[in-house]
Amino acid sequence: MAIYSKVYETSTEHSAKYIGSGELEVLSTPSLVGFLENAACLLAKEKIQNDLLTTVGAKMAIDHLKASKIGNSITVIITEVTNQGRKYDFQLEAFVDKELIAKASHTRVCVNKETFLEKL
Protein backbone atom coordinates (compact mmCIF):
# COMPACT_ATOMS: atom_id res chain seq x y z
CA MET A 1 0.00 0.00 0.00
CA ALA A 2 1.29 3.45 -0.89
CA ILE A 3 2.04 5.90 1.90
CA TYR A 4 3.32 8.48 -0.58
CA SER A 5 3.82 8.65 -4.34
CA LYS A 6 5.36 11.04 -6.82
CA VAL A 7 5.64 10.97 -10.61
CA TYR A 8 8.88 11.93 -12.36
CA GLU A 9 9.18 12.72 -16.07
CA THR A 10 12.34 11.41 -17.71
CA SER A 11 14.34 13.27 -20.33
CA THR A 12 17.73 13.02 -22.02
CA GLU A 13 19.64 14.27 -18.97
CA HIS A 14 18.39 11.21 -17.05
CA SER A 15 19.86 8.74 -19.55
CA ALA A 16 22.79 6.45 -18.82
CA LYS A 17 24.53 7.84 -21.91
CA TYR A 18 24.16 11.46 -20.74
CA ILE A 19 25.13 10.73 -17.10
CA GLY A 20 28.08 8.58 -18.17
CA SER A 21 26.99 5.45 -16.33
CA GLY A 22 26.44 3.54 -19.58
CA GLU A 23 26.22 3.87 -23.34
CA LEU A 24 22.47 3.63 -23.92
CA GLU A 25 19.62 6.13 -24.00
CA VAL A 26 17.77 4.44 -21.12
CA LEU A 27 16.99 5.62 -17.60
CA SER A 28 20.25 5.60 -15.65
CA THR A 29 20.46 3.99 -12.23
CA PRO A 30 21.91 7.23 -10.75
CA SER A 31 18.87 9.17 -12.00
CA LEU A 32 16.51 6.53 -10.63
CA VAL A 33 18.28 6.73 -7.26
CA GLY A 34 17.78 10.50 -7.38
CA PHE A 35 14.04 10.09 -7.93
CA LEU A 36 13.79 7.60 -5.06
CA GLU A 37 15.80 9.80 -2.71
CA ASN A 38 13.79 12.89 -3.65
CA ALA A 39 10.49 11.17 -2.83
CA ALA A 40 11.84 10.07 0.57
CA CYS A 41 13.20 13.56 1.25
CA LEU A 42 9.84 15.17 0.48
CA LEU A 43 7.93 12.74 2.72
CA ALA A 44 10.45 13.21 5.54
CA LYS A 45 9.99 16.99 5.27
CA GLU A 46 6.23 16.54 5.67
CA LYS A 47 6.75 14.38 8.74
CA ILE A 48 9.27 16.69 10.46
CA GLN A 49 7.43 20.00 9.94
CA ASN A 50 10.23 22.08 11.46
CA ASP A 51 12.05 24.69 9.35
CA LEU A 52 15.21 24.37 11.48
CA LEU A 53 15.53 20.66 10.66
CA THR A 54 16.08 18.64 7.50
CA THR A 55 17.07 15.10 6.60
CA VAL A 56 20.21 13.93 4.86
CA GLY A 57 20.64 10.70 2.95
CA ALA A 58 22.70 8.11 4.80
CA LYS A 59 22.16 4.81 2.97
CA MET A 60 20.57 3.50 -0.23
CA ALA A 61 20.18 -0.08 -1.46
CA ILE A 62 18.52 -0.56 -4.83
CA ASP A 63 17.57 -3.39 -7.14
CA HIS A 64 17.18 -1.85 -10.61
CA LEU A 65 15.06 -4.63 -12.08
CA LYS A 66 14.16 -3.44 -15.57
CA ALA A 67 15.34 -0.87 -18.09
CA SER A 68 13.00 1.92 -19.12
CA LYS A 69 12.87 4.29 -22.07
CA ILE A 70 13.67 7.96 -21.81
CA GLY A 71 10.35 9.79 -22.02
CA ASN A 72 8.58 7.33 -19.73
CA SER A 73 6.99 8.60 -16.54
CA ILE A 74 8.40 6.98 -13.41
CA THR A 75 6.10 6.64 -10.41
CA VAL A 76 7.89 6.28 -7.09
CA ILE A 77 5.84 4.78 -4.28
CA ILE A 78 6.88 4.69 -0.65
CA THR A 79 5.35 1.56 0.85
CA GLU A 80 6.74 1.83 4.36
CA VAL A 81 8.50 4.32 6.61
CA THR A 82 9.78 3.71 10.12
CA ASN A 83 11.24 6.24 12.51
CA GLN A 84 13.65 5.64 15.38
CA GLY A 85 14.89 8.84 16.96
CA ARG A 86 16.59 10.85 14.22
CA LYS A 87 16.62 7.96 11.71
CA TYR A 88 13.97 7.39 9.04
CA ASP A 89 13.96 4.14 7.03
CA PHE A 90 12.00 3.99 3.78
CA GLN A 91 10.91 1.11 1.56
CA LEU A 92 10.32 2.29 -2.00
CA GLU A 93 9.25 0.96 -5.38
CA ALA A 94 9.43 2.51 -8.84
CA PHE A 95 7.06 1.77 -11.69
CA VAL A 96 6.59 2.53 -15.38
CA ASP A 97 2.85 2.27 -15.79
CA LYS A 98 2.08 -0.78 -13.63
CA GLU A 99 5.40 -2.52 -14.23
CA LEU A 100 7.84 -2.65 -11.31
CA ILE A 101 11.28 -1.43 -12.41
CA ALA A 102 13.01 -1.02 -9.04
CA LYS A 103 12.83 -1.74 -5.33
CA ALA A 104 14.90 0.11 -2.76
CA SER A 105 15.50 0.79 0.88
CA HIS A 106 16.76 4.20 1.96
CA THR A 107 17.81 5.71 5.28
CA ARG A 108 17.69 9.41 6.07
CA VAL A 109 18.85 11.11 9.27
CA CYS A 110 17.25 14.22 10.74
CA VAL A 111 19.72 17.04 11.42
CA ASN A 112 19.66 20.67 12.47
CA LYS A 113 20.48 22.57 9.26
CA GLU A 114 22.72 25.18 10.88
CA THR A 115 24.62 22.76 13.11
CA PHE A 116 25.12 20.32 10.24
CA LEU A 117 26.59 22.99 7.95
CA GLU A 118 28.83 24.38 10.71
CA LYS A 119 30.49 20.96 11.03
CA LEU A 120 31.62 20.89 7.38
Question: Which ranges hold each PLM region?
Answer:
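Hydrophobic beta-strand-centered segment that forms part of the acyl-chain substrate-binding groove
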Residues: 42-75
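Catalytic strand-loop segment that frames the active site of acyl-thioester-processing enzymes
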Residues: 1-28, 43
